[in-house]
């Protein structure tokens, strides 16, 4: 497929960190996306953005579009409006991305022009029993196919993360209408479903996407984990992470003030992150150094309180990395860890 027939679009925001994330996303496409760098690139916003932001994106070859919000009850659903661009943009496949994704390699050869492409999610808050109830509520037949979630390997229906979507042009208009419709219906009825109410308004647009795909009987092709690799969680051993070399990573806003993607649990993936050159080298980024230290000592990513506190000490040179390591070793959390 020729890159000029691919449109890459994201739903941005005038607020940080989303504005900067939008810039990083398109910078990654231009730097590492190969043929994708020549694709049509559009950033959508549901509120006015600064001239500086528009200018920065234009320099990257990105057009900006102002879109109407879907519903004030769920700002995450505004991403659905990306699909409303089909009448003004010429493409064979729409690649819809969240702002907190980064392109590491050219994936154009893996785009299917005839099926919707998406990666199954790492978690499913609903579970099979609640999906049955939800499908019955909307008069839909529960799909027979079963997936396993990547984090805990629980069995569920084909339920997708919508941070990375490949949508063939013939499907875009109809999917847009159905996805939007199920979103509004879910927002109107969510209180009837305790498990949905528990997380409201999160996941609404993701549940509605799954309802739309199955309710609209669209052909879909599950993408591999390499096409939307989450860096914020530890995944099940069946995922065989050591064999993975991702095309796109989904950092879930885990990005340093200097523009470096924070580490995940897997060294082979972190080595891929080391190759991203947007700003200060990761080895000189205080937040990344603290994140590394947490992983080495506490075996988890740094929480925001610890990250901000220790990186500030490091940056101001009030404490060295060795000093901070000693502080962590003296903590109750470290002392409570099982010793190997």
Which residues does each predicted region cover?
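Short glycine- and hydrophobic/aromatic-rich loop-to-beta-strand nucleating segment
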Residues: 163-170
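A short, glycine-/small-residue-rich helix N-cap motif at loop->alpha-helix starts
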Residues: 71-78
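Short acidic donor-binding/metal-coordinating loop in glycosyltransferase active sites
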Residues: 99-101
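Short aromatic/hydrophobic "clamp" motif used to bind/position activated sugar donors
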Residues: 94
């Amino acid at each position: 497929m020729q890159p000029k027939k691919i449109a890459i679009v994201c739903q941005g925001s005038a607020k940080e960190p989303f504005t900067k994330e939008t810039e990083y996303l398109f910078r990654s496409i231009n730097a590492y996306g190969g043929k994708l760098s020549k694709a049509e690139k559009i950033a959508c916003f549901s509120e006015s953005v600064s001239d500086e932001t528009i200018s920065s994106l234009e320099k990257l070859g990105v057009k900006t579009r102002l879109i109407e919000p879907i519903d004030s009850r769920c700002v995450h659903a505004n991403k659905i409006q990306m699909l409303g661009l089909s009448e003004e943009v010429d493409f064979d496949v729409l690649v819809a991305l969240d702002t907190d994704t980064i392109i590491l390699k050219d994936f154009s050869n893996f785009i299917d022009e005839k099926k919707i492409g998406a990666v199954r999610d790492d978690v499913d808050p609903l579970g099979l029993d609640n999906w049955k109830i939800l499908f019955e509520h909307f008069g839909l037949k529960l799909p027979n196919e079963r997936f396993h979630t990547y984090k805990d390997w629980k069995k569920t229906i084909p339920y997708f993360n919508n941070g990375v979507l490949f949508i063939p042009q013939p499907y875009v208009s109809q999917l847009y209408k159905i996805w939007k419709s199920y979103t509004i219906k879910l927002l109107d009825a969510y209180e009837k479903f305790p498990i949905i109410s528990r997380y409201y308004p999160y996941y609404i647009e993701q549940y509605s996407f799954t309802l739309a795909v199955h309710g609209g009987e669209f052909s879909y092709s599950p993408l591999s984990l390499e096409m939307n690799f989450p860096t914020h969680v530890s995944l099940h051993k069946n995922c065989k992470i050591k064999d993975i070399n991702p095309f796109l990573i989904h950092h879930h806003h885990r990005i340093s003030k200097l523009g470096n993607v924070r580490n995940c649990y897997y060294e082979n993936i972190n080595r891929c992150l080391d190759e991203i050159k947007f700003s200060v080298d990761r080895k000189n980024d205080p937040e990344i150094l603290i994140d590394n230290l947490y992983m080495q000592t506490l075996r988890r990513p740094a929480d925001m309180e610890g990250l901000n506190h220790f990186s500030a000490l490091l940056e101001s040179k009030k404490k060295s990395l060795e000093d901070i390591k000693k502080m962590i070793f003296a903590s109750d959390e470290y002392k409570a860890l099982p010793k190997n």
